[in-house]
Curated annotation (Swiss-Prot):
The keyword Nucleotide-binding applies. Residues 1-32 are annotated as: Disordered. Gene3D superfamilies: P-loop containing nucleotide triphosphate hydrolases. This is Putative helicase L207/L206. GO terms for molecular function: ATP binding; helicase activity; hydrolase activity, acting on acid anhydrides. The keyword Nucleotide-binding applies. Keywords: ATP-binding, Helicase, Hydrolase, Nucleotide-binding. Its EC number is 3.6.4.-. Pfam families: AEP_C962R, D5_N, DUF5906, PriCT_2. InterPro entries: AEP_C962R (IPR056443), Helicase_put_C_phage/plasmid (IPR006500), Helicase_SF3_DNA-vir (IPR014015), NrS-1_pol-like_helicase (IPR045455), P-loop_NTPase (IPR027417), Phage/plasmid_primase_P4_C (IPR014818), PriCT_2 (IPR014819), Viral_Helicase-Primase_Cplx (IPR051620). Residues 646-807 form the SF3 helicase domain. NCBIfam families: primase_Cterm (TIGR01613). It comes from the Viruses.
Length: 960
C-alpha cells in the first residue's frame, strides 16, 4: 500500500529532489509543468499503481545530483544523457554506478520507459546498431530470423579473425523493437546486437565494421529489405565511439519503442545455439537486471579487460587499415558532417598502437643501449624489456631485437617478432620510468652521463635562483623516483627498495636541495673559477661573475623558506592525478623487502616504479626447501587444526587465493567452531605472512547501518590493495548486514575517505573472513547472499595441560583433541617465509584447478541457511499443511501472526510484509498470487474436523 505522504511527492524542476507538497505548497508553475512533462514522456502502463510513479521520480532525483550544468557543460566528463524530455547531461561516478543501476532497474520493472543513454569509454563491448530505412509504403518488418543469424555469423567470423575469444565469451545478444516506426516519411526498423563479454577499443571496431559492410554486400544478406539507405548508414558508425547507447529498456523518444532481447546466441564449433526459449519470462526482475548489465557500453573498468588479439594478427596492419578508413571518411564529400565527426572522434581513436614524440622515441632508444647482457640473458627480464618497449611505441621493435642480440645463444629474430605482436594484445603498465630505472641500475655511469647534458642546461637556467628553475632541475634529476599524489594535502611518494613509500611533506626531496644541488652548483662554481683563469680578459670577467653569482644560489639552496617554495613548485611539476588510483592496483604482484613476486609470470624479480606497489610483506623473499624444519613444523600445525586431508587442502588453497587481488570466487568465508580450535592462530600466521597486505576490519562495518557517502570512512580507506581482511567476532545479538557483504565480494568499485582527505575509489581485492564461535544471524534469504557465504568448520580442540581432566591425562585425548602449544605465538613469526612458499605452491595449483569446496563446507553452509531462515522457522511453528485447496491464510493475516511470534523468539526488527510475501511467492508452491494467500495451510491453533492436520514441518514443500 502507498501512504498518503508518498502520493503527494513530486519532482522539483530545479533540484530534481523529491519534495512533499504538504511542506512546499508554493510550487511554481514552471516546476509543475516540468513534472507533467517528465511523467507524460516517461510512459507507464495504465494498470500500474500510483506508487510506481515514485520509482521514476527516485531515479530522476538521483540523476539530478550529478547533472552537468551550463550550456557548454563543465570539466566533468559526461557519462549519461537523457535524449528526450526532461533532457540533460550527467556525470555519474563509478562508485555510484551500482546504486544508479538499481534505481534504473526499479523504474524499468515498474513499467517505465525512460530515454537514458550512456556514453562510451575508450574501451568497451562490441555493439552494433543496424538501422533499416524503408519507404512509407513498406511499413511491415522485412528482416527475418535468417537475416539475424546471417548477421551474427558474419560478425562472429570477423571477431575470430582479430580476437582470441574463449567459447564462454562468445555470447551474442540480439534485441528488437516492437515494430517499425514512421519517422520523417520513412519507416525505421533495426537491430541492436551486443557482445557483452568481449572488450575492444573503438579503433578495432572501426576495422570490423568496414569488413562487415564488405561481407554484407558480398553475400547480399539484406537484399530482401527494401532499403532507402546504403549499407554504410545501415551500420551506424557513431555508435562505436560518440553516439549515446540506449540503456536496456530505454527508448529514443515517446514515439519510439525500446529494444528488448529476442535472441541469445552461443557459438559452439561455428554453430549458433539460441538459448532464449519461447515462453521464457524475459521481463522478470532477474532477467532485466542481467540485461541492463550485459547491454551496458560502460561495463568494463580497465584496459586490462581488453580481449587479446588472435594469434598472427599484426597490430601494424590494423593501424594501416585505420589510416585508410580515416582517409575515406575525410574524402567523403557527400556527408557535410564528416569532417566535424572526424574532429570529434580524434586521432587517438584511429591509432591502434601507441606512438610517442620523436624526442621521447630517441630517448627510449638511447636508454635501451645501456641495458646489461645479464638482462638480455634472463628470459623474464628480457621479456619485461620487450613489454615495456612495445607499450611505449611500436617503432621500438628493432631496438628490442638489437638488445636481444646481446645474448647470441638465445637470439631468434622470428621469436622477437612473434612475441612483439602478442605483446600488443594487452597493454602493460610499463612506461619510460621503467626504462630509466633499468638503465640507472645496469650502467649508472653512462646513464648519468647521458642525463648530464640536460641537467647542465638546467643548472645554467637555475643561476637566477628562482623557485621554478630550481624545481625543474630537481625534478629532472629525480622525476621517476618522486611523485606528488596530492598538491592540496601535500602527499608525496618516493620509490625506494622496490616500492613506493609515502614521505611526509616530501622531506627527503627537500633534503636533496641542500645535499645534492648544493654540490652540483659548487662543482659548477669550481669549473667556472678554473675556466676564468684560462680565459681572455672579457670572458674571464664573465666567468668570474657567474662563479660569484653561484655563491648567492648556494646560499638560497640552504635557506629553509626558499626550499619550501621550491617544493611547492616541484608539486606542480611532479603531480600525477592518477597516482593514488593506480597505487597497489596490480592484482598479481606481492612486494617484499628484496623485490617483487609476479604471480602471473610465476617469478621473483626486482621491483620497478611502474609496478606501483606501496604495500609490503616486510620481510625478504627466500625460497625454502620442503625438507626444511620450518615446513615440517607448519605441516604439523595444519594437520592438527584440520585433521581431515580434504579440508586441509581446501584451507591451504583458499588462503593461497589471498596472495592475489582477484576476487573471482566472490565468496565470504565464515570460520567457525568452538573456542581453542586453532582458527585464530591460523589467521595470525596469515597476518605475519602477508604483512601490509593483511588488515583486520571492525565488525561494526558488517553489523551497523552504512554511514552517508560524504562522511569519512577511514576503516575502508586503508583497505585499498589489501588481500586478506578478517572481521572480529560479532556479539550474540548482532545481525550481518548482507548489503556490505555483497559490496565486499561483488567486485564493484567502492568509495572511501580517510580523515581530512579526498574520497578514493577502488575495487576491493581482499578476501573477507569472519571468525566466530557462534554463527551470527543473517535474515536475508536471497540466493545472492547464500551463494557467497561459505561456512568453514574447525572441529579440533586444543587443551592446555593445566585445564585437562584426570581422564584426559590418564587415558589420553579424544579424537580431534590435541595438547595446546603454549609457545606457538612465539613460533608463528618465524614461519612466515616458509608459509609464503607453501601458499605460492598452492596458488599455482589453484590457477590450474580452481577452488573446490568440500562436502563438509557445503553441509555446514546449508545448515547455517536453515538456521537463519526466519520464515521457515515461523511457518514450521505456526502452520500445518492440509489437502484442502480451499483452506488457506492471507499473507497479511500471516504477517500479523508473524509479528507476535517474532517478538517472542527474536530480537531486533521483524522482517516486513513485503519480504514475507516474496518468500512465500518464490519458496511455497501453494501460494495464490491473485488472492495473495497461502493455500493448503492453516494455523496450528485451528481445529480441522476432517482430521487433515499434519503437524510435521518435514512435509512442507519448499521450492528453490
Amino acid at each position: 500500500m502507498t501512504s498518503k505522504t508518498e502520493n503527494k511527492k513530486s519532482v522539483s524542476s530545479k533540484t530534481g529532489r523529491t519534495t512533499n507538497n504538504s511542506t512546499n505548497k508554493k510550487t511554481t508553475e514552471k516546476s509543475v509543468k516540468n513534472v507533467k512533462t517528465v511523467k507524460n514522456n516517461v510512459s507507464i502502463d495504465k494498470n500500474h499503481s500510483i506508487r510506481k510513479n515514485n520509482e521514476w521520480e527516485r531515479l530522476y532525483a538521483f540523476m539530478m545530483k550529478y547533472r552537468v550544468k551550463g550550456e557548454k557543460g563543465s570539466n566533468l566528463p559526461v557519462t549519461h544523457t537523457m535524449c528526450d524530455a526532461p533532457y540533460g547531461k550527467y556525470n555519474i561516478p563509478d562508485d555510484m554506478r551500482s546504486k544508479f543501476l538499481r534505481l534504473y532497474e526499479n523504474a524499468i520493472v515498474a513499467g517505465f520507459k525512460p530515454h537514458i543513454t550512456e556514453l562510451h569509454k575508450e574501451y568497451g563491448p562490441i555493439i552494433i546498431d543496424l538501422d533499416f530505412c524503408q519507404p512509407k509504403e513498406h511499413g511491415k518488418r522485412y528482416y527475418t530470423e535468417i537475416t539475424i543469424r546471417n548477421v551474427v555469423k558474419l560478425y562472429n567470423s570477423i571477431i575470430k579473425k582479430y580476437l582470441n575469444v574463449e567459447h564462454s565469451s562468445f555470447v551474442t545478444y540480439v534485441s528488437e523493437k516492437e515494430r517499425p516506426v514512421l519517422r520523417n516519411g520513412e519507416y525505421h526498423d533495426g537491430l541492436h546486437i551486443t557482445y557483452p563479454y568481449i572488450c575492444t577499443q573503438p579503433s578495432l571496431q572501426f576495422v570490423m565494421r568496414e569488413e562487415f559492410i564488405k561481407l554484407a554486400k558480398k553475400y547480399k544478406i539484406f537484399q530482401k529489405i527494401p532499403l532507402t539507405n546504403n549499407l554504410e548508414s545501415v551500420f551506424d558508425e557513431g555508435v562505436i565511439y560518440k553516439t549515446g547507447w540506449l540503456l536496456y529498456g530505454s527508448r529514443k523518444n515517446e514515439n519510439s519503442y525500446p529494444y528488448y532481447v529476442s535472441h541469445c546466441f552461443l557459438s559452439i564449433r561455428n554453430e549458433l545455439h539460441d538459448y532464449i526459449i519461447p515462453g521464457d519470462n524475459l521481463k522478470s526482475r532477474e532477467n532485466i537486471r542481467h540485461f541492463i548489465n550485459t547491454h551496458s557500453c560502460r561495463r568494463f573498468f580497465s584496459l586490462n579487460d581488453l580481449t587479446p588479439l588472435a594469434e598472427g594478427v599484426d597490430p601494424l596492419a590494423i593501424d594501416a587499415k585505420l589510416k585508410k578508413i580515416k582517409e575515406k571518411i575525410n574524402n567523403n564529400t557527400n556527408n557535410t558532417n564528416t569532417h566535424k565527426n572526424t574532429a570529434e572522434l580524434g586521432d587517438h581513436h584511429f591509432n591502434f598502437i601507441k606512438a610517442v614524440s620523436e624526442e621521447t622515441l630517441v630517448e627510449a632508444k638511447n636508454l635501451v643501449k645501456l641495458f646489461s647482457v645479464q638482462r638480455a640473458t634472463d628470459y623474464h627480464t628480457w621479456y619485461q624489456v620487450g613489454r615495456c618497449l612495445s607499450n611505449i611505441d611500436h617503432r621500438l621493435l628493432e631496438d628490442w631485437i638489437t638488445f636481444s642480440k646481446k645474448c647470441p645463444s638465445k637470439f631468434k629474430k622470428e621469436e622477437c617478432e612473434r612475441l612483439w605482436r602478442n605483446m600488443n594484445m594487452k597493454p602493460s603498465n610499463y612506461t619510460m620510468a621503467t626504462l630509466h630505472y633499468f638503465a640507472s641500475k645496469d650502467d649508472p655511469d653512462k646513464y648519468f652521463e647521458m642525463k648530464k647534458l640536460k641537467i647542465d642546461g638546467l643548472i645554467k637556467e637555475g643561476m637566477e635562483a628562482s623557485h621554478h628553475t630550481i624545481a625543474k632541475l630537481l625534478i629532472e634529476k629525480y622525476k621517476f623516483i618522486y611523485k606528488c599524489a596530492s598538491i592540496k594535502n601535500g602527499i608525496w611518494y618516493e620509490f625506494r627498495n622496490h616500492r613506493w613509500i609515502e614521505i611526509d611533506s616530501a622531506y627527503t626531496l627537500r633534503n636533496l636541495i641542500s645535499e645534492v644541488l648544493v654540490n652540483e652548483y659548487a662543482n659548477r662554481q669550481r669549473i667556472l673559477f678554473g675556466e676564468a683563469t684560462r680565459q681572455d680578459a672579457e670572458n674571464k670577467k664573465e666567468k668570474f661573475n657567474d662563479a660569484v653569482n653561484i655563491t648567492k644560489v648556494i646560499k638560497q639552496l640552504n635557506n629553509n623558506t626558499f626550499k619550501n617554495g621550491v617544493i611547492k613548485e616541484c608539486a606542480d611539476i611532479a603531480y600525477d592525478p592518477n597516482f593514488l588510483r593506480n597505487l597497489d592496483e596490480n592484482n598479481y604482484l606481492i612486494g617484499f623487502e628484496n623485490g617483487v613476486f609476479d604471480l602471473e609470470a610465476g617469478i621473483f624479480r626486482d621491483g620497478c616504479p611502474d609496478d606501483c606497489i606501496s604495500l609490503c610483506t616486510n620481510y625478504k623473499y627466500i625460497e625454502i626447501d620442503e625438507d626444511d624444519e620450518t615446513f615440517k613444523n607448519i605441516n604439523g600445525f595444519l594437520k592438527k587444526i584440520q585433521p581431515d586431508k580434504s579440508m586441509r587442502e581446501y584451507i591451504l588453497t583458499l588462503l593461497s587465493t589471498c596472495l592475489s587481488g582477484t576476487n573471482s570466487e566472490e565468496s565470504f568465508y565464515v570460520l567457525t567452531g568452538s573456542g581453542a580450535n586453532g582458527k585464530s592462530k591460523l589467521m595470525e600466521l596469515l597476518k605475519y605472512t602477508l604483512g601490509d597486505l593483511y588488515k583486520p576490519m571492525d565488525i561494526r562495518l558488517l553489523t551497523e547501518k552504512r554511514s552517508s557517502s560524504s562522511s569519512a570512512s577511514p576503516e575502508l580507506a586503508d583497505k585499498k590493495g589489501i588481500r586478506a581482511c578478517p572481521f572480529d567476532e560479532p556479539k550474540a545479538s548482532d545481525e550481518i548486514n548482507t548489503g556490505f557483504m555483497k559490496i565486499f565480494t561483488g567486485g564493484d568499485t567502492i568509495t572511501a575517505r580517510a580523515l581530512y582527505k579526498e574520497p578514493i575509489y577502488f575495487k576491493p581485492q581482499f578476501k573477507p573472513f569472519l571468525l566466530c564461535n557462534e554463527l551470527p544471524t543473517i535474515k536475508s534469504d536471497d540466493d545472492g547472499t547464500w551463494r557467497r557465504l561459505k561456512v568453514i568448520p574447525f572441529l579440533s580442540k586444543f587443551i592446555k595441560h593445566s585445564e585437562a581432566t584426570k581422564k584426559m591425562k590418564k587415558e589420553g585425548l579424544p579424537k580431534n583433541h590435541f595438547w595446546a602449544d603454549t609457545s606457538l605465538s612465539e613460533k608463528l613469526p618465524d614461519w612466515k617465509q616458509g608459509f609464503m612458499c607453501l601458499l605460492l605452491k598452492y596458488f599455482r595449483k589453484y590457477r590450474k584447478h580452481g577452488l573446490i569446496h568440500p562436502k563438509l563446507v557445503t553441509q555446514h553452509t546449508v545448515e547455517y541457511r536453515k538456521k537463519c531462515d526466519v520464515f521457515q522457522d515461523f511457518i514450521g511453528d505456526y502452520l500445518v499443511r492440509v489437502d484442502n485447496t480451499k483452506k488457506g491464510i492471507s499473507v497479511m493475516d500471516l504477517y500479523q501472526n508473524m509479528r507476535e511470534w517474532y517478538k517472542s523468539n527474536y530480537t531486533g526488527k521483524c522482517p516486513n510484509a513485503k519480504d514475507l510475501r516474496n518468500y512465500v511467492q518464490h519458496r511455497m508452491p501453494t501460494y495464490n498470487k491473485n488472492a495473495d494467500m497461502l493455500t493448503c495451510y492453516v494455523l496450528k491453533t485451528e481445529v480441522n474436523q476432517a482430521g487433515e492436520l499434519i503437524d510435521d514441518i518435514d512435509n512442507i514443500t519448499v521450492v528453490g
